[in-house]
């Protein structure tokens, strides 16, 4: 397996916390500590524009499939709804008073899940953009959301080190799982739905059987916090991004380490914490505290 840096998108003046690919091919959105959400062209790797200004740092961006909108979760607790057809912000979802850390949508139910530092997840109708439910998960932050491929269950990662599994039909708690010794920052179900991968401040990847949520494997994956775990859309691999400035690519079936992308390994990589990843085909995109977006071309053997 090889990894080659093919582009670097520069222009952000502050750390970048998150990114989201558009439903339109070759368009990327990024956000962080800057005063706006940025749109990029991945065909020629150029800056397009600042989509709209924001009053607080952007921690989460989400484009629900089939809806012409982009949701932006802010440090202030506000979620801005940008409409691509009208080319403007049409609504601000005002419920949370503390930072928004993750936003995901449930296609079958046409619902939106928003996780906050206030320890709750709010549930919204995608059709009306009205809140329909609130789940109190923890006394502390809910950092991340993962929805099972069959959309029957949802996992929430919390700062209290726990992972909470809920039934997506009626939002009842199915199981609370404990294994991490520190805050859980990222969760991802395998594309076939057989297991859940978790990572966080303790730098471990834990693999959980998604039928009974028992631990299958523990991988001492990074030197510092794992900020993101992301499965390749079609190939049996997943990538991890860490505060240790490295990206690692693992086998999704054998859990072997196949590639390390870091300066230590001779790659022109990030010089500060890597916060989020996105797969665009076999290209891996990464954003960092170092203010840059890097595009890696991954050749799988």
Indicate residue ranges for each PLM-predicted region:
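WD40/WD-repeat beta-propeller blade N-cap
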Residues: 9-16, 52-58, 94-100, 136-142, ...
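Residue-level detector of Asp-centered blade-edge/turn motifs that repeat once per structural unit
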Residues: 23-24, 65-66, 107-108, 149-150, ...
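Conserved strand-to-loop turn within each blade of WD40 beta-propeller repeats
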Residues: 31-34, 73-76, 115-118, 156-160, ...
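Short loop/turn segments that connect beta-strands within beta-propeller blades
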Residues: 42-44, 84-87, 126-129, 168-171, ...
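Blade-level signature of beta-propeller repeat domains, shared across WD40, Kelch, NHL, RCC1
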Residues: 273-301
């Amino acid at each position: 397996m090889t990894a080659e840096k093919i582009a670097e998108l520069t222009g952000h003046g502050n750390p970048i916390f998150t990114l989201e690919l558009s439903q339109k091919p070759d368009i990327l959105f990024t956000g962080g500590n800057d005063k706006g959400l940025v749109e990029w062209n991945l065909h020629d790797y150029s800056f397009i524009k600042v989509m709209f200004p924001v009053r607080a740092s952007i921690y989460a961006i989400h484009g629900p499939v089939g809806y012409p909108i982009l949701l932006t979760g802010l440090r202030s607790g506000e979620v801005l709804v940008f409409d691509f057809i009208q080319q403007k912000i049409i609504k601000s979802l005002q419920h949370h008073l503390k930072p928004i850390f993750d936003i995901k949508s449930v296609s079958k139910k046409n619902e939106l899940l928003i996780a906050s530092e206030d320890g709750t997840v709010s549930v919204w109708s995608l059709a009306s953009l009205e809140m329909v439910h609130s789940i109190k998960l923890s006394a502390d932050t809910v950092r991340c959301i993962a929805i099972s491929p069959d959309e029957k269950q949802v996992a929430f990662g919390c700062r209290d080190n726990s992972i909470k599994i809920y039934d997506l039909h009626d939002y009842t708690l199915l199981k609370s799982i404990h294994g991490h010794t520190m805050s859980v920052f990222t969760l991802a179900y395998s594309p076939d739905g057989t297991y859940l991968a978790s990572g966080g401040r303790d730098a471990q990847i834990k693999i959980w059987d998604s039928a009974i949520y028992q631990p299958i494997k523990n991988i001492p994956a990074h030197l510092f916090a794992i900020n993101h775990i992301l499965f390749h859309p079609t190939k049996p691999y997943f990538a991890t991004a860490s505060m240790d400035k490295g990206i690692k690519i693992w086998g999704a079936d054998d859990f072997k380490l196949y590639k390390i992308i870091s300066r230590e390994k001779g790659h022109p990589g990030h010089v500060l914490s890597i916060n989020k990843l996105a797969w665009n085909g076999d290209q891996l995109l990464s954003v960092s505290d170092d203010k840059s977006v890097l595009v890696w071309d991954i050749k799988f053997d």
